[in-house]
Amino acid sequence: MSDIGFFARRYGPPPRQDRPATVLVHGLGLSGRYFVPLARRLAANGATVVVPDLPGNARSRAAARRAPDIAQLADALAGLHRRLSLGPSLVVANSVGCQVAAALAARHPHLVSRLVLVGPALEPRVSGRRQFGRLLADVPREPFRLLWLAASDYLVTGPLRCAASFHRSLRDAAASFEVNLARVRAPTLVVRGAGDTIASGRWTRRVAGLVADGRAEDIPGAAHAAHYSAPDAMAALIEKFTAGETG
């Protein structure tokens, strides 16, 4: 789909008012491609799944003349909801995409029925140098195919734009991330791969405590991109969460 102003993939049946869609939000500089395994599993169980490349990233690079900030990306997602008539949706985000999802839920609460934050980044009060070090430490913990996908996405998005997005995301993390999380009223599941070096266990538990109705889960054997390396476990957690089950 490209008639929404930027590129998005759709899996499963067309959206219906009586069945909330699922929107998957990628991390910094990436595309939605690393969400495809999870999208296919959710769609196989009847979900309508929309996976955009956010404006300025990958196949949507031309949709923004410069790197958008977090609030602009959240507003772009709100526009996607309206253009596709998605209504209140389950929003699943990874990494810096969690900042975008939190801003969406805070700025446009009527569009988010439930929220799943996978490896939320960037952690406030952690310097850019330390954040980058955490990213490097995570690299050997991820599947090789994911590293190839990420590298090719970064090249398409462009190193300079990735760097600009990183600095904008750092500023949002320091100024707005926790503020937005505290404004989230949708039930929220915070998921962390047990081997994630980017989103610490202490931070993910704090995220779950900041939102009005939050809970945290770990996925053993996974790292930062748990949705990619453990899509079956992630899909099971999401489906349990959307069914209203806890614990």
Where are these regions (language model features)?
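Alpha/beta-hydrolase fold catalytic core
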Residues: 1-22, 44-47, 86-87, 156-157, ...
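Catalytic histidine-centered segment of alpha/beta-hydrolase-like enzymes
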Residues: 222-232
